Structures are given as C-alpha cells and as structure tokens.
Amino acid sequence: MIALSVIILASCTSKPEQKNENKTETPNPFLTEYTTPFQVPPFDQIKNEHYLPAFEAGIAEQQTEVEAIVNNKETPTFENTILPFDKSGKILSRVRNVFFNLNECLTNDEMVAIAEQVLPMLSKHSDAIMMNPKLFERIDYVYQHRNEMGLDDQQIRVVEKYHQDFVRSGAGLTKEQQAELSQINEQLSTLSLQFGNNLLKENANYKLVIDKDWNLAGLPQTSIDAAAEQAKNDGMEGKWVFTLSKPSLIPFLQFANNRHLRKQLYEAYYNRGDNNNEYDNKSLIKQMLELRLKKAQLFGYENFADYVLAVNMAQDSKTVDKFLIDIFKPAQELAKKELAEMQEIAYKECENAENEAIEVQGYDWWYYAEKLRKAKYDFDENYIKPYLTVDNVRNGMFMAANKLYGITFTQNTNLPIYYPDVETYEVKEANGDFLGILYLDYYPRESKSGGAWCTSFRESGHDINGKKIYPVISLVMNFTPASGDTPALLTWDETETMWHEFGHSLHAFFSDGLYSRTCGNVPHDYVEMPSQIMENWVAEPEVIRMYAKHYKTGEVMPDSLITKIENSALFNQGLMTTELIAASILDMKYHEITSIDEIKNLDVDAFEKQQMDAIGLIPQILPRYRSTNFAHIFNGGYSAGYYAYTWAEVLDKDAFNYFKSSGDLFNPELAASFRKNCLQECGNDEGMVQYRKFRGQNPDNEPYLKARGLK
C-alpha cells in the first residue's frame, strides 16, 4: 500500500509528552530549509510543540502565495499563475509529510490531539484555495487559452489537471453549494480520523493470553517465543500473548491445534469496530457514506463511486462491477475445490482420532490449508523461514533493483532517524548520481499502525527555479522481530510484502518531472502496478538464489525447497482471490448507493451480509476486510477504489510476462522502457497510454488468470 494521501491512523497507547513550562523554546525546524545531510527531516530536533505553529505558518505562507497570484494584474499565463501555484506551500508540505507519517508509526496522545485540531484546519484551508473564485478565474483563463500560449505537452497537461482538480473541488459550484461542500469535507476528515483511531484502539485492546503451554500445541517455536516476549513486555512474564497484528495472528490461525482459541482470535480480528462499544465504527460508516453521496450529488453524479471513478482508468462503476464479478465467479469455484480438499483432511483427522466429524469453518481455513499444502506439495513454511531473514530479503530486493536499473543502496548510519531500529540508505544511479534516501522501518510497536505501506517525507520534483528535489521515502512494515539468537525471519507472504512496498519506493525514486502536479501522480487503479510487479521477481528461482541463504550456515536455499515454492504458487489462490474480490465488491456496493434515505436506514452488518449473499459468497469466507475495519475505504483514500489492486494486477502480470517471455528476467531494454514510461514519466499522460508505450499493446489478462489459478 502506498500513502498517496497520507492515511491518518493513530494509536493512543503511548504516554503524552509532559510539558515543562520552564523549558527554553527551541527553533522550529519546519520553518526553514533543513540543514541536515540530504535535507532529510531532523527527527532529533522535532518536538510535538513544533507541529501546530508550523501548520499555522504553512497555511499562512500558502495563503500569501495564493493572494500574490490572485492580485497579479497581468494577463494570466502559465508562468505567473500555474507555476507559482504548483510550487506553493513548501512549509505546509514539510510539516504535513512528517507529522502524518509519524502519526501512523510513532504516535502518542498529544499527536492524536494535534491531528484532531489540524485536520479541520487543513480541510478549510484546502477549500479556501480550491473554491477561490479569483484564483479559479485565472486558472480557467489559462485553461481556455492553453493551446494558444506556446506551451509544451507537459505544461498543457499540468494546466488540464489543475483545472480538473478545481472543478472537482467545487470551483464551479454556487456559493451555497460551496459552503455545503466545505462542511462535508471538514466532517469527512474528522470522521475518517475517528474511524482509524477506533480501529487502533480495537487492535491494541485485544490480547489472547495463554497460561497453559498445551494450548500452544502445533505452533512454531518462533511464534511461541514472540508471544512470550509480548507477554513479558505486557507485564505477564511466564505467559504467552497473541495479538491481532498479522505476524502474531496468521501463524496462530495456521498452526495452533486448539480450535476454540483459533476461533477466538479469528472472530476478534474480523469483529474489530463491530463490538457495540465506544470504538464501534458502524455509525461512522453511515455518516461518511451519507456525506460522500451528498458530495457526489453536488457535482451531478448519481453515486459516489462514479464521482471517484471519473478520473480513474476504469472510468465508471459499471466497468468495475463487471470486471470484479467476472473474476469472482471462477475464483470462488476454485475456493470451493480447496474447501472440499481441506474438508477431506478434516474428516480423516477426526476419524483417526475417533472424534466427532467437524465442518471446516472460516477460522479453520488457514489451519487446514496449511495441512493441505503439506500434503499436496510437501511444503512447510517453517522450512523456508530460516533462509528469509529480514537482511537477506532486503539485500535481495536491492540486488534485483540493481540488475534491473543499475541503482545502488548504501547504508548511511549518520542520518537522523525517528526510532532506534530504523535503517537509512542512500540510493544512487549506476553512474553515482544521487536519487534519494530510503528509510526502512521493519518492526511493530505500540505506537504504530498495523499493516505495511510506503510513504514519503519528501516527494521527488523540482523547485520553481528548476533545481532537482530528491525524494525521501519510507517503507513501514510490521514483521516479527528477532528473538534471542534467532534473527527476524519472514514468512513467504511477508517477503512478498516487503518487495511490494519496495516497488512503490522505486516508483517514487524514478518519478521525475518539472511540475508537482504530474510528477509521479497517477490514477488509483494504476498506482499498485509498480509495487505489485516486484512481487513477480521475488519468487523466480534465479532470484531466490540471489538472496535466500540460511541464517546459520549461509547455505543457499536448495533447489528442492525452491521447487516446492514454485509448485505451491497456486496454493490457496481460491481463498485469496475470493476474499479480495468480495471486499472490492462490498466497497463498490456501499458507494453505489443513490439514496440518502437508504443510508440513513442502513444496518451496516445486514447490508454487508445482503451484498455477500447476493454474489453467493460461501460462509467459510469473509471479505478480506469487514465493513467496520475496512480502513482502506473509510480511513485510507481507497473509497470506491479497492478494486484498484486487482485492476493493477492485470497490468503487472502482463508486464512481467513481457520480461519473462523475452528470455531475460532482467532484460535491460525492457527495464529501461518500463522505468521511463511506467515509472519516470508515468504522470505525463493517461495510465493506459503510458502502459502501451512500454508494452506496445493493451494488457492481456491471460497472465493474471493463470497466476491466480483461474485458467
């Protein structure tokens, strides 16, 4: 996942910073250019007290910049209107990038309170700019005369995109409609933050505490050790604590023999935000859906989905609906076959143990799927984990990027970091030219949101004088840390996750352009393609041999294990695809509602069940996210956009097949073309136009269908 519009998630578990009334005021680092190496954020100097004044100063600065544009008496041109607007808001960008990123991965009560204060300020500020009639008048003038001003193609695209932004932000509405829209935007920002805060509280508040070691039967030692460490950290030494974070949750569902405890953990995870307590999200969902529909209707759209999709590759909801259901049907048929095979294993186990037969349920799926993988492919995840240390996987992705693009990654331990175990790397071209800085933040902590994402402390671009601005990118994960003498070991899924987020970082490093509006900016249903394509290289035998080495012996992963990884590539794809598409359909159905009254009368749980019943989702499978914990769409910028992961996967599978069919996984000509057309210049034209420049044709969906086991 990439934080395009930074996802505002926060945890309230850390103690707020204690204020000292006698302390000496320190200079606010956000108010001047950073003086650190490579101008990375001076994390060692930043204090909570700096944020609010910096936001206020940033808003004031950009207001002054906009006023200067508006008050210019000269005829509007690209140079006196579009360019200065494109480069405005430096202070605001500086503080926003740091604050909201740290609020996701190193938050505390004081930062949560600041976010609650700042979000309405930012919403009002944005609306004041985007609905400024005099500013829009100047932008509209340039837009209407863009073909007569001698502008180049990129300048014309920048003008067109800004004009589109202003129109979609309410510049063409009446004053009464603008006032309503401003109120809607402010409310949505607050509700979204609250949804995320509730989810973090739900995550943090649940712990499965085990005090009898026989309840650990079946679990790998690494999971047991991690649970013991968690218990120790929670003041329960001698016990074992399992949480709802994926590194704790998934192994328990895969390997724990205690079915009752598997059910407890499974239900706790899927019921987050739906417990009818102070952190319940159902009311927030209804409020957001109503506000989003009102917003869409202000712009003349029948529903919010069509408003969102109008600027995406898919264009409209009907296209997305057909795309999703055409995949869902064969995916669920595959899932039913997987279920039948697992049920057979369950029956045999019960028969051998002379126990009453069980029917496989959702909380059994991962457990019996693991047994099925062992039976069909002789594949045990615990056999490969010793080869997949965090360091090995990281070095492998660096080597792959070097073979593709010639770039290098050199660790620099002298840069400011925001947490002790964060790593920093200088990224350079093959000729030594500087590309940017990469931060790697691997491990969970109480103050950090769950999941994995790529975000930026500074975006690539150029300043108003044409000077290059180098990106500062961060990959944030939640992997199980080292324990005792055992280093941090990754599952195969976590290995793919790291390479996925790394793909986002390559997109960020390579994106280049003179103008902020188009540099690296792509539609939502394109943005996951640069990340997902890297997941294809990670599983190739040639590549596995580059990085998978046993942490004790240094031995390269043997071919027998690599073959098992290859043979099990389609393992559990029925479930994985079905739950993903089901969640995407649920997202669309929420945002295709056309009636305010329907939303007011909505029962969230009943609506979810109704939509899943309508597509025939089998009861053993839930959508990947249930409504009340679907942060992507209610807290993360993917509303009416979760389908984008699948849409982009069709592109990435086709693109990788192009590499593979060339006979060289690291084909230098194809790599150069992919970098230029799909990463570097991706914002220069529409997504499919840029893709065709690389591929020479529209994407073929055959590679996707084969990779998912659907053909």
Segments (PLM) and residue ranges:
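Sec-dependent signal peptide recognition
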Residues: M1-A3
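Bacterial signal peptide processing site
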Residues: T13-K15
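C-terminal, non-catalytic "cap/extension" segments appended to globular domains
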Residues: N20-H50, A57, K239-V241, N392, ...
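Short His/Asp/Glu-rich catalytic/ion-coordination signatures at enzyme active sites or charged loops
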Residues: T35-H50, F99-V118, Y141-Q183, T243-S283, ...
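Active-site-proximal, well-structured secondary-structure segments within enzyme catalytic domains
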Residues: Q154, V158, T190, N197, ...
